[in-house]
Amino acid sequence: MAAEKRVFLDISVDENLIGRIEIRLFVEDAPKTCENFRALCTGEVGMTPNNKARLHYKQNEFHRIVKKFMIQGGDITEGDGRGGFSIYGRYFDDEKFKLKHSRPYLLSMANKGPNSNSSQFFITTAAAPHCNGKHVVFGEVVKGQNVVDYIDNLAVDDKSKPLAKVLISNCGELVKKKKPLKTDEELAAALEEKNNNARDNEIPKCPKSWLYRDDDNEKKHEMRNDKRREYRSRRSRSRSHEKNRDYKKENRGDSSRSQPRRDENGITVRGRGGVRFRRERSATPEHWRRNAPTKWVHDSHKHPEEDLV
């Protein structure tokens, strides 16, 4: 969406200022035509190529007034309707004939035929359907309609030229002003007033986060927590029982456990079970005796001469 643009025309009659006309340009519908008119209001382009005239509406006349139809001006080269010059050259082409001349106070381009737009324009003072499809509508008067009506009621000659001298004494582009920044004291006072006027119903509710749980989920969550607490309680009790058992084992006064076990011969016995063997040397079993060798092995390997020594 194109930014809205507005221009103004200060009008004087016989060197007496009568008021200002403010015009809103239809930039979206006719951007090229609007830019031509805006630049001619500001005079930013400079002079025509032959330096004959300045590309500016300032001190330009409304040279034609047709009662109950329109007021016409913008001839920056001749001043009588025979000239004109655009910021694009002598002429430029027509844009879309989208908007109709359906009411008064519409801004439209004057021309000499198709694609002959220059700097001349007119403002309607009544509906003009016969201009549809021939002239491009590109703006409307938003303030100063009474000034347009005043010009429309001026006396004219037989060629529709006003008898009084109607001039554009000044013109330009309107720029929307930014609001001035407040001082620190004003900002503090405004903030304090805003806080004092705050109401409970104006405070927005806290948004639901991903941690939010509705009633059903909250009940399930509580049940899970109860189970966890019960499990932890049982586990804690079992651990306390184990600690108590270990403590009793370590501190009970049992003489049988405080002294090592010994057998009948006084030898220390390890382990918990009873003794299953005898520690003293027993007699060699008979079957071992029968199978015992009668001659030692190392004696059989002696040299025969060793016995003679």
Swiss-Prot record:
Q: InterPro entries in the record, alphabetically? A: Cyclophilin-like_dom_sf, Cyclophilin-type_PPIase_CS, Cyclophilin-type_PPIase_dom
EC number, UniProt record: 5.2.1.8
Q: Its catalytic activity?
A: [protein]-peptidylproline (omega=180) = [protein]-peptidylproline (omega=0)
Q: Which UniProt keywords apply?
A: Isomerase, Rotamase
Q: In which tissues is it expressed?
A: Co-expressed with pdi-1 in the syncytial hypodermis.
UniProt xrefs under PROSITE patterns? CSA_PPIASE_1, CSA_PPIASE_2
Q: Which Pfam families match?
A: Pro_isomerase (PF00160)
Q: Which GO terms describe its molecular function?
A: cyclosporin A binding; peptidyl-prolyl cis-trans isomerase activity
Which EC main class describes this enzyme? isomerase
Q: Name one GO biological process term.
A: protein folding
| Chain ranges of the PPIase cyclophilin-type domain | 8-173
Could you name the domain of life of the organism this protein comes from?
Eukaryota
Q: Does the keyword Isomerase apply?
A: yes
Its GO CC terms are: cytoplasm; cytosol
Gene3D superfamilies with a match to the protein in the record? Cyclophilin-like
Q: Where is the composition biased (Basic and acidic residues)?
A: 217-229, 239-265, 280-289, 296-309
Chain spans, region Disordered: 217-309
Q: What does this protein do?
A: PPIases accelerate the folding of proteins. It catalyzes the cis-trans isomerization of proline imidic peptide bonds in oligopeptides. Thought to function as a catalyst in the folding and modification of cuticle collagens.
Similarity comment: Belongs to the cyclophilin-type PPIase family.
Query: Can you name this protein?
Result: Peptidyl-prolyl cis-trans isomerase 9
- Provenance organism: Caenorhabditis elegans
